[in-house]
Regions:
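Paired small-residue
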Residues: 87, 98-106, 292, 303-311
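Short amphipathic helix-loop junctions that connect adjacent transmembrane helices
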Residues: 27-43, 232-249
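Conserved MFS/SLC helix-loop-helix module at the cytosolic interface between two early adjacent transmembrane helices
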Residues: 58-95, 273-276
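Structural signature of the two symmetry-related core transmembrane helices
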Residues: 75-90, 169, 280-295, 375
Length: 395
């Protein structure tokens, strides 16, 4: 029973982590305006502030993953939760855009809570239940994503965005305490000197493992397209309602409703992957999300944009559980922490590239072109994963 207690504590912890993230990060463009950045330069600073954290997190991912395998996954989860809480606290005391940039760089250094938690869960549950529990973990993140924008929009209206950062810090420090007290890492074989190697060796192994490399590329492309969209949502909604008045509340409501739709379908995709194969689930979910993003470029009203957001959410929530389960199946247990560390690096690098691409697109084209490009990229990724599926029927 203790192992299941550990799993559920981690799943609940990911809910609070996601809540803290989505109650603040999507609204950073508004915080930049509050800090005095001009409307003309907010696109540039949005791209820099978003991407800086992901660049640093991408560099640190293999380091934290290796330390998870050598020094303990729980220790890495505690480290990440505590330091992320510190980064949010720093976000509440910044006074200009340069200080906010420094806060995001530190946040990128602290990153790794989800990767460490997923590594613990995948090492704890039986393989036959892997898809289900990874689906539960993804559902928890989605539910946090639902509550976060509601809380972020409400808190920014009631106490302002600055004080909202302190609330987020409290969330992460409570998560730290819960992991320390309740989570038990499963016993594993002692680390052998023969298993030691450099991070370059880990990267070479990932490149030589064809299935793992394909999955890492999928993490990268998927996250890049998601993060092309995230920084522009509030600005796009402001265009659709022809005003930036109360845009935080409107955007929070739409993103949360989309999250509710996604939460209802996550476990379905996890079970489909277990029964029909994870590659099949990956192809179906990425295709549906790509079509949905293309359609999102069409609406000229808030209502229909929200409907399209719900459609995208229903599909995109099913991608990561299947990617995570497939990653577990194609890597040995002794490499599990590093595998999730590398997947975290791929996601963070995608997260870094995405906002920069969207910022560049908006310099020369309307915002809706970001949605068109993201949809095309996802459809191409789905086709590539289908080609990989033809040679990897075991997954």
């Amino acid at each position: 029973m203790k192992k299941y207690r550990s799993i559920w504590v981690l799943i609940i912890s990911m809910f609070f982590m996601a809540s803290a993230y989505t109650m603040l990060i999507p609204f950073l463009p508004l915080y930049l305006l509050e800090l005095g950045v001009s409307q003309a330069r907010v696109h540039l600073w949005t791209g820099l502030v978003f991407s800086s954290a992901f660049f640093v997190a991408g560099i640190m991912g293999p380091v934290w993953g290796k330390m998870a395998d050598t020094r303990g996954k729980k220790r890495m989860a505690v480290r990440a939760a505590f330091l992320i809480g510190c980064s949010y606290f720093l976000g509440g005391i910044v006074h200009n855009e340069w200080q906010l940039l420094g806060m995001r760089i530190f946040q990128g250094f602290a990153n790794g809570l989800v990767a460490a938690s997923m590594a613990i869960i995948s090492s704890t549950v039986e393989e036959k239940a892997l898809g289900t529990y990874l689906g539960f973990a993804q559902t928890s993140i989605i539910l946090g994503g639902i509550c976060g924008p509601f809380m972020g929009g409400g808190l920014s209206h009631l106490i302002g965005m600055r004080d909202s950062f302190f609330v987020a810090a409290l969330f992460l420090w409570l998560v730290t305490a819960a992991i320390v007290i309740f989570v038990r890492e499963p016993a594993h074989a002692p680390w052998k000197k023969s298993q030691e190697g450099s991070i370059a060796d880990d990267l070479r192994y990932a490149r030589s493992n064809r299935l793992m490399f394909e999955l890492l590329m999928a993490y990268f492309v998927l996250q890049g397209t998601i993060m092309m969209i995230q920084p522009v949502v509030t600005l796009y909604i402001g265009e659709l309602q022809h005003s930036m008045s109360n845009v935080a509340v409107t955007a929070g409501t739409i993103m949360s409703c989309g999250g509710i739709a996604g939460a209802l379908t996550t476990t379905f995709w996890g079970r489909l992957g277990q029964k029909k194969g994870y590659y099949r689930a990956i192809c179906m979910t990425i295709s549906g999300a790509g079509l949905g993003m293309l359609i999102q470029s069409i609406p000229d009203s808030i209502f229909w944009f929200g409907v399209c957001q719900a459609m995208v959410s229903c599909f995109i929530v099913g991608v990561n559980p299947s990617l995570n389960a497939a990653l577990v199946k194609c890597t040995p247990e002794s490499f599990r922490g590093r595998a999730f560390g590398l997947s975290n690096t791929a996601q963070q690098m995608g997260s870094m590239i995405g906002p920069l691409l969207s910022a560049g697109i908006m310099e020369f084209m309307p915002i809706y072109m970001v949605y068109i490009l993201a949809g095309i990229v996802l459809l191409y990724l789905a086709w590539r994963m289908y080609q990989a599926h033809l040679h990897s029927v075991s997954l």
